[in-house]
């Protein structure tokens, strides 16, 4: 889990645009971020299995 200070730091508007980076809205993880949902892969998978994200289904072919 990300430290609270890092979450707050990422949420503040940056002085320069290139310094901004994405973090998961739930856990604050900076890696494996999915822009479309605003979540990291761990939180996305958890919420998808619980049915909390509308329109998401497990792939089967």
From Swiss-Prot:
Zn(2+) binds at residues 24, 27, 40, 43. Part of the 30S ribosomal subunit. Contacts proteins S3 and S10. Signal peptide: none annotated. The keyword Nucleotidyltransferase does not apply. The keyword Chloroplast does not apply. It comes from Symbiobacterium thermophilum (strain DSM 24528 / JCM 14929 / IAM 14863 / T). One of its GO terms (cellular component) is small ribosomal subunit. The gene is rpsZ. Binds 1 zinc ion per subunit. InterPro entries: Ribosomal_uS14, Ribosomal_uS14_bact, Ribosomal_uS14_CS, Ribosomal_uS14_sf. Belongs to the universal ribosomal protein uS14 family. Zinc-binding uS14 subfamily. This is Small ribosomal subunit protein uS14. Gene3D superfamilies: 30s Ribosomal Protein S14, Chain N. One of its GO terms (biological process) is translation.
């Amino acid at each position: 889990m990300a430290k609270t200070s890092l979450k707050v730091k990422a949420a503040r508007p940056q002085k320069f645009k290139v310094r901004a980076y994405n973090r998961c809205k739930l856990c604050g993880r900076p890696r494996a971020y999915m822009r479309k949902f605003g979540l990291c892969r761990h939180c996305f998978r958890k919420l998808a299995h619980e049915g909390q994200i509308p329109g998401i289904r497990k792939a089967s072919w």
